[in-house]
Amino acid sequence: MKCIVGLGNIGKRFELTRHNIGFEVVDYILEKNNFSLDKQKFKGAYTIERMNGDKVLFIEPMTMMNLSGEAVAPIMDYYNVNPEDLIVLYDDLDLEQGQVRLRQKGSAGGHNGMKSIIKMLGTDQFKRIRIGVGRPTNGMTVPDYVLQRFSNDEMVTMEKVIEHAGRAIEKFVETSRFDHVMNEFNGEVK
């Protein structure tokens, strides 16, 4: 069973913020397929659905971002999901808006939600889709920036990015060939 995790912070005030882009992609896939996060356990909202005949576990941690691993690891453990079947979607300050990077494995790169997942799983050997949100300008702090909502102009780009990342997930579920998905979906979304 594949496991798709979108990272974000819970609560209305965090909706459509840069830090919640992982939630937005998972929500896009769920809505497109008429699925919903119908279970809550282990500090997470999740569902198990069938896509292309395969079971897929979708998770949105109901912790704050920095504790995401406290939701992801127990749910994966409960359903016997191996880290190699995990893909985590999250915001990345080091990529410009409109950039998407798929990777087989790697460090947290300073992202506290990823640090928590790596710590709780005891490995960084899992797939991830990094979604560029750019860096703050005009002296804004990083926390203020990532917790800020996208402007209307930015949302035009980010809606394309959300759809693009959603298609990458669907392609991976369909083919199980993350190397091919990386070749097709890495880069700037036009």
From Swiss-Prot:
Protein's cellular compartments: Cytoplasm
UniProt keywords (A-Z) are: Cytoplasm, Hydrolase, RNA-binding, tRNA-binding
Q: What GO CC terms are in its UniProt record? A: cytoplasm
Site (Stabilizes the basic form of H active site to accept a proton): residue numbering on this chain = 91
Q: Where is the active site?
A: 19 (proton acceptor)
Q: Which residues bind tRNA?
A: 14, 64, 66, 112
Q: What class of enzyme is it?
A: hydrolase
Q: What SUPFAM superfamilies does this protein's entry cite?
A: Peptidyl-tRNA hydrolase-like
What EC designation does it have?
3.1.1.29
> Which Pfam families does the UniProt record give?
Pept_tRNA_hydro (PF01195)
Against HAMAP family, the record matches this protein to: Pept_tRNA_hydro_bact
Q: Return the protein name.
A: Peptidyl-tRNA hydrolase
Q: Which organism does this sequence originate in? A: Staphylococcus aureus (strain bovine RF122 / ET3-1)
